[in-house]
Amino acid sequence: MLPPIKVKVGEPIVIQLEDNPSTGFNVCLTEMPQGIALADVSYLPGQALPGMVGVPGTRRFTFIALAPCEGPLLFNQIKFTHPEPTVQEPTPMENRFVIVES
């Protein structure tokens, strides 16, 4: 298990996770503490040689700590299939614990 992320109210929290949408799976935020707000989500494509497809990139989640709190920031790889989505168990990088202090 990774050490907790400790921040103060008003500070940003940035989590970067490998993501490869070409597989049909996407990294999705599935749980976060109430004192944290999701401010931005972006995707940074990976470096690929000409002609390469399916190269993983990075999904970047930016949060702002709004109030003292603690709890998990949980992400899952989800493939939105029919009739039920396929949800993979989180890796250690996708299962973080955050402590926000005043």
What does each of the following model-derived ranges do?
Residues 1-102:
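Extracytoplasmic soluble-region selector
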